[in-house]
Amino acid sequence: MSGHSKFANIKHKKEKNDAAKGKIFTKIGKEIAVAVKEGGSSDPSNNSRLRDVIAKAKSNNMPNDTIERNIKRASGDMSAANYEHITYEGYGPNGTAIIVETLTDNKNRTASNVKNAFTKGSGNVGTPGCVSFMFDKKGQIVIDKEEYEGVADELMMQVLDAGAEDFVEEEDSFEVLTDPDDFSAVRLAMEEAGIPMVSAEVTMIPQTYVELTDPKDIANIQKTLDMLDDDDDVQDVYHNWDE
C-alpha cells in the first residue's frame, strides 16, 4: 500500500545536538517515572505503558543504562505521582492546529508558559477539543526502507498478520500504523521477529495538512514550536503544518 503520510513532520523535532538530546532524555525520564508509578511495576513485562515509553526512549537513542537508571530511580521515588497529564490545544498562523501534551507538577506555570508560546507566535490557546478532532491517535512504527529493498510485500504481510492496521510506503521508509490499544502487541511481535525499527510510539496524525507560504507565518509557527520544545513541562507537540 502507499499513501500520503508525513511521518517526519508529525511531531516537531529540532536538530538533536547534545543539548537537545539532554532535554529529550530528561523529558523521557519523567515519562518513565510516571509510567512506573501509574503502571504499578518497574518490570516492563508487567507494565505495558512502561514498555511503550521504553520503545520511545530507544527511538530517541537513549542509552540502555540511562533507561535502567531512570526505572530504578522511579521505583523508589514517589514524587513522580505528583505529575499531572494536561493537554492543551490551539491555533497557530493561518489556522494551523497544534496539540501540546504536558506532564507538570505546577499547572499554573505550565498554562502560562504554553499560552505565552502561542501568543509569541501570533496564535492562541483554544478550548479542549478545538483541534484534536483534526487528528487520529495511532501507534506508528517506522522502518528503514533500505533494510527491506525488494521484499516490501513480504514485510507488509508480516506486520499486518501481527495486527497492524496499515502499511504505508514512503520515499525512504515504511510506516506501520496500529490502533493505540494494539500498539504494544504489534511492536513486540515485530521486535521478536527481528524487524529493526527506526521509531515506535503512539502519536497524533493529522487528517489534513496546512501549507504556510508567508515567511512571517512560518517564522511565527517556528517560534511557537521552538518555545514549546524548550519547555521542560512539554512532553510532545503535534501539529498539521506542512513543513
Residue ranges and their predicted role:
Residues 140-243:
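Positively charged, low-complexity, intrinsically disordered RNA-binding extensions
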Residues 1-126, 130-142, 239-242:
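N-terminal cationic and glycine-rich segments that engage phosphates or anionic surfaces
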